[in-house]
Amino acid sequence: MDPNPRLLILLVLLAFSATVAVAEDGESTGGSKVSLGRRAGGFLHGLKKEAVVEGDHGVALDEVGPGLFDALFASLSMILVSEIGDETFIIAALMAMRHPKSIVLSGALSALYVMTVLSTGLGRIVPNLISRKHTNSAATVLYLFFGLRLLYIAWKSDPKGSQKKEMEEVEEKLESGQGKSTLRRFFGRFCTPIFLEAFILTFLAEWGDRSQIATIALATHKNAIGVAVGASLGHTVCTSLAVIGGSMLASKISQRTVATIGGVLFLGFSVSSYFYPPL
């Protein structure tokens, strides 16, 4: 029996359509695979770029790390040798003998923290107005001046003398200022009088002091955060010692010893600033 021609034609058309459908399905699958491959490649390329950027940041942080700790150590040691036995130290010690230690400590530290932030800010502004080379030269000269001045004080001072005489002078200043209390009474309505007194006396005593000028000089060519943190830690240690046992400590420490250590440290800063200037 001969097959029906119409049936054969129908079978051929069905087979052809199935083949075309399979081919189109394969092309769409392949296209989607190519698209997915491209997307995956782009994603991996982006991850690679991010990894490179993160790696660069990691290197930068590693480079900043030593500078941060170097500035912290320099400012901390500078404050320790400058403030022990200084006028701000003695003010805190004398006030703590007559007033609650916690209030005196909080008032004095508040003033010193504000002064540290101001000094560090000035140290960062100056290089934007003056070239880094000139600011580094100025810092070198300042360190040298303070170092020689402290060594001169150590040479002229009595080797057996203590800080008692300076404590008496500062106490006379405090007593002479008791009558001028109009401003204190005015601010006393808003702040604790003892806190305000400790803040004002410490702030005025620290303004223009060698530790403030040295902090500004350090901030011009060292890491500002390290300088601020180190100076704040140094002030915290010195002021706490003054409040807790300042009178006893000041009477035991020789002025010559403190001045000698401070002079050597500042001379070391001067040599370091001259031979290892910032890039």
Swiss-Prot record:
Keywords: Membrane, Signal, Transmembrane, Transmembrane helix. InterPro entries: GDT1-like. It is a multi-pass membrane protein. GO terms for cellular component: Golgi apparatus; membrane. GO terms for biological process: calcium ion transmembrane transport; Golgi calcium ion homeostasis; Golgi calcium ion transport; manganese ion transmembrane transport. The keyword Transmembrane applies. The keyword Transcription does not apply. It is found in: Membrane. Residues 1-23 form the signal peptide. The chain crosses the membrane at residues 64-84, 103-123, 135-155, 186-206, 224-244, 258-278. It comes from the Eukaryota. GO terms for molecular function: calcium ion transmembrane transporter activity; manganese ion transmembrane transporter activity. Belongs to the GDT1 family. This is GDT1-like protein 3. It comes from Oryza sativa subsp. japonica.
